[in-house]
Amino acid sequence: MNEKKEQALFEYDAKLSISEAIPMGLQHVVAAVVGIVTPGIMIAKVCQLSPSDTTILIQTSLIFSAVATLIQLFPIFGKVGSRLPVMMGASFAYVPILMAIGADFGIAAIFGSQLVGSILVIIVGLFIKKIRVLFP
C-alpha cells in the first residue's frame, strides 16, 4: 500500500517559502481588490461624489482593509486578531442601507452613521460575556 502523506499549505506557525508565498499573496490581492473597491464605487455613484472624492473613498477602503488584515495576521496584545492569513475587506451587507442614507442625506451622514454604529459595537463588545446568556 502506497500512502501519500498530504500536508496542509498553511499551518498555524508555518513559514512559507517565497515561491509559495508570492502566488498565494497575489491570488488573495486580486480576489480581494474587486470586493473592496466595488462598495465604494456604488456608494460614490449614489452620493454623486466627484472623481477625486470617489478616489479618496476607494483608497480609504483599501487602506483600512489592509490595516484590518494586518491586525488579523499580527494580533494586538495577543487578544485582537486570529494569527491566520485572513483577508479583510468591505462588507456588501450594509451597501443597500448606506446607499439609501447617501441618496437622502449625503456622504457625511454615511460617515456619521458608521461612527455611531462602531461606538455601539465597541460598547456591546465590552459587555459580551454578560449579554451572551440572553442568547442560548
What are these regions (language model features)?
Residues 21-135:
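Early transmembrane hairpin of solute transport permeases
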